[in-house]
């Protein structure tokens, strides 16, 4: 009976695998898969539609067409299962075996596999050590290869043409063997002795760099073959597998035509050519005919495997290239991305969304018809359970008739059953959220207004999809993790995502504004109820200032009890009434101000931190309801008259026009260049526009009123347009400026500014020319948006791919590493405070009190709102925090290093996929970034050139570590450091501001000086760069000869003459000599640099104006020459999305600057053609030198001391240089700061830790330097975690570990070089990745998320992580049980009849493990 039941059992594959291995199939393996040889190219008989025997669809080989029925119809039904029909030879079984049974074709001549030949670098070429060209000539029968030279002087692997071959045959007879075609290559491959070849190469890893590189590449491939046990000759095919027929279907269409998969065509060609070749060989046809046929067979096989890879692609009847096996798996519509990573979903529906203002945050309105369809199976099962319907069919009828009982059941089924709503594009995890459905009439889904921000949805026709989680586990996850009321913070920044916008904000803002001399001003109320009654009786107005007695509750931190306190508060009627909805424990002061959008956001944030999630959600809902109600009550509307155009506008425009005329005049008289004229004109109009908008805002924002005492006073305006902009409901000052000020300057599509401004505004209306000018830039904007979306999506895809395997795997890795964090200060302004940067991170070391060194926070504890306030009060200004980059967890990251989960507000949970979260957080705002490259000029150069810097706050002066200065004869301090900074600390020693001071600046302050705000710190000449001497002495010119290296220039205005160094290209004879100056001391000897025997030599660069005479006495700090700065070319700054992509791809910038390779003294060597030789000598006397093009701006001069990593040639830094010279911490800081700059410009908040997570993934590979006793090859790239594990194992055995250096890879490179071949193949360059993996016989450990999605397992993150851990534990337990049982059986066999309870104990012990 059991065996009978087995017949009906569903076949379930055993899913417990932990890794997937890829390799190359041997001919034996291919034959073992096969169920028969395909001999004929026929497919199916066009009359009977039955497959031809031995053809491509043969039933004998591949299985029956109908379930349990042979082809000729002799055996039908289940009882014959497994019988093989003697007439037609078909096995009686299910037809689905046609999806898994393979066939094979025996090739009459071997054929090389094109992937191993043409996928670069060519694997065949590496193994044989031949060039790709030579191999191709052999394979396609253009040349012979010598496979066995015998006793002749010929070389094995030698190539000879047809004529050579004939000549050599005459000469040597049959002494040597040479072949052409894949046979020759196969013989060579079989002749390779892997072991001896590897030994030879390992010994040969010396010599020139090219040779070493080539040898190590070959070595790697050969080692891979040896390690994986794959024979090289398998790269040449003797037998070709045939795909199961149902995977390359042939479907008859009406009218006798067939739709077929291209593969059938390709296979047909191979079979045709193969059988023709076989026949030719049997007939012993002339060599040349057979050769041609072999070549055609090789080409047919190539096309089948990868069409178009070599030569022209094979085409079908309609001139379209046929889709080969390789095309099936690669690209967006290939197997990986189309079917494995994204699948279609059942139980889903989509419809238009409309607003649901009465819903609670965790609800959505679901149309009844949609719900009925989605929950059908649940309804059927209820109907059967209740006995209303006996069968599914009856239940179906019942539902379709729509009886009332069905609707009752639907209500019941839907209760407590969350559904998921998704709006495309899903850019971050808040794009899918779960809601409890509420049944509604109509056909549109109702959405809660507060979740619109997270979905980026609006109600102008957006559609959303609904998905039903079916299993209990899925429902549970949807409810606990995805319910909208559990996702109130953005994972990117930790800010609330449920912030009201638009009309709600306007309503709340209007209610909380105060009006001078409003109705009922000055009244005093005993409680809020009284205020409400007075308002209802129309005794007071909403915005009147009144005093009210209000009771506040403060929560005790330890006990959680509330203590009330009551006081009289000056407020307004609206605010007092609004205070009723405040959650218990929030002070009234939070709401006692005009509530703008930012304030409301802060309010919700404070509520979340102080009162918890539940209270906050309820509070947000109440805010929403009140906002809608109050906006309606306020009745704010706008009219043309609200757009007040300032009277002064006309005057400002006239004045600017006059200035422009003057400049035109100057240009005509030749006083200014055309570029200067353009810049100045743009400047004037830019200023005019700003001025008009200032005047306009001043007019809009204030209004005059009479107060209670009859005086005229100003108050904030109640102008509707102003209120909308001020509250943050809609519009901004810039938009109002276009409506009521002047539109100002417009840009051309290339980003340059048109110098004719639009002086009109929208209220006045534009004339034709103005309209035309404005269309120019506007159209560019539309085109940009389309590009931007695609680019941003691609960036997100690359980011997700590089981080997808990063998951929190342990609680604490125990490292003490970390980065010092301090506030970001730029140009004296705090851009990001220390508080914002360390909030939600963990301390790396104990945080000490700055004065008495007591411990304020222990290492490993997290900074939260409360203890940060404590730190700020104590004056802590820098903190060492744990970061994702210093985390020492292998294959993952630890919770302590990551810190707070921004989307939830607590410490991150183990199993959270922080990599994907980081990628989404950076990619999601991508569409808001600009696409354009900013041209310096016009708008950008408007910032006037700074010539001094002043303090913005009181404090004490300090300098940074690299600051150096000398005192000159006038007793002024002259800066001689390249990267000097002045730092101002307050009385607690906290850094308040930090200012860069250029080389040659004169300091107006000393260290530790007390200063007041507004004090000038330093000043300098912005138009020239000085060259300054650090030593005293008498000048002695060298090579300064007029007409040769310098020219005399006479100033037209002053009549003074100066010497200017001329360009060597314009000089005659003295191309090589450098004009320079030496210093002579009193005794006539050359002044030396202290501590060395270098004499002080200062070179004058091209274009320098020499400020001294020969033989003049100079003191330290004196200016020897000045270089006009004007010479710097304006370069375009890449901004927006392209900049972010550039940083994450770790590309070297176009004209990159140069950093000092080591600490030492600068000198210039002999110049070569067009290049300057820059040398740095360190204290030990080691010299490093490099050639710098003359047009580059060198920031250092002869004799200057530079620190390692300091900038010596102007230009953007190369991330690779930063990593090499300054280490990974500096690199991380550079990338984080640069990326943040781009986002900050657009007002997007992203937490630093997301960028750090990406940088960690960019640094996850290392390069092996010294191999120690590992099996690596020098120069090989290895996963960092694997390297560390290997080294730990070696240390434990007392062997020599390998040394390595960090490697920075761009995100695309990093994704492709991941250890998981499945993930890399599904990302890009599928062919290359799979070829490499197959040769190496790679194992994919299925660590990342992507691999697991592709093979269809639960992902090892979140709840899946627990599942996998439990599964592994169970496997180990089973193993232990099996061992115990085996042992007990062995013991019994040994004749001992010991108590069986011991085995039970053993298995229990294993279980308790």
Swiss-Prot record:
GO biological process assignments: DNA-templated transcription
GO cellular component: DNA-directed RNA polymerase complex
This protein's record includes keyword Nucleotidyltransferase: yes
Keywords noted in UniProt: DNA-directed RNA polymerase, Magnesium, Metal-binding, Nucleotidyltransferase, Transcription, Transferase, Zinc
Disulfide topology: none
UniProt cofactor(s): Mg(2+); Zn(2+)
Catalytic activity, as annotated: RNA(n) + a ribonucleoside 5'-triphosphate = RNA(n+1) + diphosphate
Chain spans, region Disordered: 1385-1409
Low complexity bias spans: 1385-1403
EC number: 2.7.7.6
Residues binding Zn(2+) 2, per UniProt: 813, 887, 894, 897
Annotated GO MF terms: DNA binding; DNA-directed RNA polymerase activity; magnesium ion binding; zinc ion binding
One Pfam family named in its UniProt record: RNA_pol_Rpb1_4
Family: Belongs to the RNA polymerase beta' chain family.
PANTHER family (UniProt xref): DNA-DIRECTED RNA POLYMERASE (PTHR19376), DNA-DIRECTED RNA POLYMERASE SUBUNIT BETA (PTHR19376:SF54)
Subunit annotation: The RNAP catalytic core consists of 2 alpha, 1 beta, 1 beta' and 1 omega subunit. When a sigma factor is associated with the core the holoenzyme is formed, which can initiate transcription.
Role this protein plays: DNA-dependent RNA polymerase catalyzes the transcription of DNA into RNA using the four ribonucleoside triphosphates as substrates.
Annotated NCBIfam families: rpoC_TIGR
Name recorded for this polypeptide: DNA-directed RNA polymerase subunit beta'
Lineage: Bacteria, Pseudomonadati, Pseudomonadota, Betaproteobacteria, Burkholderiales
């Amino acid at each position: 009976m059991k065996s009978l039941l087995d017949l009906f059992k569903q076949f379930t594959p055993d899913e417990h695998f932990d890794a997937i291995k890829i390799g190359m199939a041997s001919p034996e393996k291919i034959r073992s898969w096969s169920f028969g040889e395909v001999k004929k190219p026929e497919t199916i008989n066009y009359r009977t539609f039955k497959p031809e025997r031995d053809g491509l669809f043969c039933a004998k080989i591949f299985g029956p067409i109908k379930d349990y029925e042979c082809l000729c119809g002799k055996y039908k039904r289940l009882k014959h299962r497994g019988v093989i029909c003697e007439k037609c030879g078909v096995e009686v079984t299910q037809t689905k075996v046609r999806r898994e049974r393979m066939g094979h074709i025996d090739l009459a001549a071997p054929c090389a596999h094109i992937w191993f030949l043409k996928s670069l670098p060519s694997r065949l070429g590496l193994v044989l050590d031949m060039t790709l060209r030579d191999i191709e000539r052999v394979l396609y029968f253009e040349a012979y290869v010598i496979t066995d030279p015998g006793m002749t002087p010929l070389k094995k692997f030698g190539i000879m043409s047809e004529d050579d071959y004939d000549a050599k045959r005459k000469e040597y007879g049959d002494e040597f063997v040479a072949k052409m075609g894949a046979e020759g290559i196969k013989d060579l491959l079989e002749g390779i002795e892997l072991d001896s070849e590897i030994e030879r190469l390992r010994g040969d890893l010396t010599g020139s760099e090219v040779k070493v590189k080539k040898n190590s590449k070959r070595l790697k491939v050969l080692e891979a073959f040896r390690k994986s046990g794959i024979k090289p000759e398998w790269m040449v095919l003797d037998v070709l597998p045939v795909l199961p027929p149902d995977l390359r279907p042939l479907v008859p269409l009406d009218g006798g035509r067939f739709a077929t998969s291209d593969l059938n065509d390709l296979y047909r060609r191979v079979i045709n050519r193969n059988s023709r070749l076989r026949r030719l060989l049997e007939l012993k046809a002339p060599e040349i005919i057979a050769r041609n046929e072999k070549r055609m067979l090789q080409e047919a096989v190539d096309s089948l495997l990868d069409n178009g890879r070599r030569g022209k692609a094979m085409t079908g009847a309609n001139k379209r290239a046929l889709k080969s096996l390789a095309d099936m798996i690669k690209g967006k519509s290939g197997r990986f991305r189309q079917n494995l990573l994204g699948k279609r979903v059942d139980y889903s529906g989509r419809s238009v969304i409309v607003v649901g203002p009465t819903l609670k945050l965790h609800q959505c309105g679901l149309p009844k018809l949609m719900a009925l369809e989605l929950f059908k199976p649940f309804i059927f099962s209820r109907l059967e359970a209740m006995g209303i319907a006996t069968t599914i069919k009856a239940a179906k009828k019942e539902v379709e008739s729509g009886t009332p009982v069905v609707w009752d059941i639907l209500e019941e089924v839907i209760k407590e059953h969350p559904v998921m709503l998704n709006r495309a594009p899903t850019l971050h995890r808040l794009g899918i959220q779960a809601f409890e459905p509420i049944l509604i009439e109509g056909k549109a889904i109702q959405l809660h207004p507060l979740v619109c921000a997270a979905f980026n949805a609006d109600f102008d026709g957006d559609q959303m999809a609904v998905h039903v989680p079916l299993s209990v586990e899925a429902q549970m996850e949807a409810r606990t993790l995805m319910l909208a009321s559990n996702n109130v913070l953005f994972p990117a920044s930790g800010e609330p995502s449920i912030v009201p916008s638009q009309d709600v904000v306007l309503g709340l803002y209007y209610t909380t504004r105060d009006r001078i001399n409003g109705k009922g001003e000055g009244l005093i109320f005993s409680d809020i109820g009284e205020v409400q009654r007075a308002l209802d009786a129309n005794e007071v107005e909403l915005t009147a200032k009144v005093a009210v007695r209000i009771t506040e509750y403060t929560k005790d931190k330890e006990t959680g009890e509330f203590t009330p306190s009551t006081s009289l508060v000056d407020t307004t009627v609206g605010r007092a009434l609004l205070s009723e909805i405040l959650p218990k424990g929030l002070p009234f002061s939070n709401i006692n101000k005009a509530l703008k959008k930012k304030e409301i956001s802060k309010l919700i944030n404070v509520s979340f931190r102080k009162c918890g999630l539940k209270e906050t959600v309820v509070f947000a809902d109440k805010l929403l309801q009140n906002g809608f109600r109050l906006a309606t009550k306020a009745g704010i509307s706008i009219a043309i008259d609200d757009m007040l155009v300032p009277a002064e506008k006309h005057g400002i425009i006239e004045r600017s026009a006059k200035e422009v005329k003057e400049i035109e005049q100057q240009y005509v008289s030749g006083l200014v260049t055309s570029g200067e004229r353009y810049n100045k004109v743009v400047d004037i109009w830019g200023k005019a526009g700003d001025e008009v908008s200032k005047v306009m805002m001043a007019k809009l924002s204030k209004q005059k009123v009479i107060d209670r005492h009859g005086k005229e006073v100003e108050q904030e305006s109640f102008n509707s347009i102003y209120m909308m902009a001020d509250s943050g409901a809609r519009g901004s000052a810039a938009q109002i400026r276009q409506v009521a000020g002047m539109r100002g300057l417009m840009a051309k599509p290339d980003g340059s500014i048109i110098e004719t401004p639009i002086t009109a505004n929208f209220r006045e209306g534009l004339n034709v020319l103005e309209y035309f000018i404005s269309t120019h830039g506007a159209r560019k904007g539309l085109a940009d948006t389309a590009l931007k979306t695609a680019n941003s999506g691609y960036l997100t895809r690359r980011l997700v791919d590089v981080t997808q395997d990063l998951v929190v795997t342990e609680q604490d890795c125990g490292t003490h590493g970390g980065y010092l964090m301090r506030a970001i200060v730029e140009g004296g302004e705090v851009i990001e405070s220390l508080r914002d940067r360390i909030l939600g991170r963990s301390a790396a070391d104990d945080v000490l009190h700055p004065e008495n060194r007591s411990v304020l926070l222990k290492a490993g504890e997290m900074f939260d709102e409360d203890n940060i306030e404590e730190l700020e009060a104590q004056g802590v200004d820098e903190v060492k925090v744990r970061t994702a980059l210093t985390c020492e967890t292998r294959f993952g990251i630890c919770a302590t290093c990551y810190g707070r989960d921004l989307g939830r507000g607590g410490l991150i949970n183990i199993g959270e996929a922080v990599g994907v979260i980081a990628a989404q957080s950076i990619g999601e705002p991508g569409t808001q970034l600009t696409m354009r490259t900013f041209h310096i000029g016009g708008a950008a150069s408007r910032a006037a050139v700074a010539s001094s810097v002043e303090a913005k706050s009181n404090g004490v002066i300090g300098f940074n570590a690299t600051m150096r200065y000398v005192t000159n004869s006038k007793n002024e301090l002259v800066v001689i450091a390249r990267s000097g900074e002045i730092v101002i600390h307050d009385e607690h020693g906290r850094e308040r501001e930090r200012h860069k001071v250029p080389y040659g600046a004169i300091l107006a302050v000393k260290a530790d000086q007390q200063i007041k705000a507004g004090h000038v710190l330093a000043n300098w000449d912005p138009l020239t760069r000085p060259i300054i001497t650090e030593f005293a002495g008498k000048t002695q010119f060298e090579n300064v000869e007029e007409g040769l290296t310098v020219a005399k220039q006479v100033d037209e205005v002053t009549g003074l003459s100066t010497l200017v160094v001329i360009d060597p290209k314009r000089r005659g004879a003295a191309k090589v000599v450098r004009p320079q100056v030496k210093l002579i001391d009193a005794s006539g000897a050359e002044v030396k640099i202290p501590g060395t025997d270098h004499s002080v030599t200062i070179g004058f660069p091209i274009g320098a104006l020499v400020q001294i005479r020969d033989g003049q006495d100079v003191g330290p700090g004196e200016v020897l020459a000045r270089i006009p700065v004007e010479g710097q070319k304006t370069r375009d700054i890449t901004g927006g999305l392209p900049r972010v992509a550039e940083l994450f791809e770790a590309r070297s910038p176009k004209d990159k600057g140069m950093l000092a390779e080591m600490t030492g003294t600068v000198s210039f060597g002999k110049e070569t053609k067009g290049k300057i030789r820059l040398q740095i000598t360190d204290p030990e006397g080691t010299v490093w030198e490099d050639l710098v093009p003359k047009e580059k701006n060198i920031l250092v001069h002869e004799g200057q001391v530079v620190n390692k990593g300091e900038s010596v040639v102007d230009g953007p830094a190369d991330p690779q240089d930063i990593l090499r010279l300054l280490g990974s911490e500096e690199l991380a800081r550079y990338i984080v700061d640069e990326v943040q700059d781009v986002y900050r410009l657009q007002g997007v908040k992203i937490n630093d830790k997301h960028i750090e997570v990406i940088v960690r993934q960019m640094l996850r590979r290392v390069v092996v330097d010294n191999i120690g006793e590992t099996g690596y090859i020098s120069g090989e790239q290895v996963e960092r975690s694997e390297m560390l594990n290997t080294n730990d194992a070696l240390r434990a055995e007392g062997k020599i570990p390998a040394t390595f250096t960090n490697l920075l890879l761009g995100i695309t490179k990093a994704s492709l070089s991941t250890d998981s071949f499945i993930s890399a193949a599904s990302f890009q360059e599928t062919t290359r990745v799979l070829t490499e993996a197959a040769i190496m016989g790679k194992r994919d450990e299925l660590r990342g998320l992507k691999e697991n999605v592709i093979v269809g397992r639960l992902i090892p993150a979140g709840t899946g992580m627990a599942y996998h851990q439990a599964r592994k534990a169970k496997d180990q337990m089973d193993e232990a049980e099996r061992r115990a049982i085996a042992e007990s059986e062995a013991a019994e066999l040994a004749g001992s009849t010991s108590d069986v309870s011991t085995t039970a104990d053993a298995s229990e012990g294993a279980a308790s493990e």
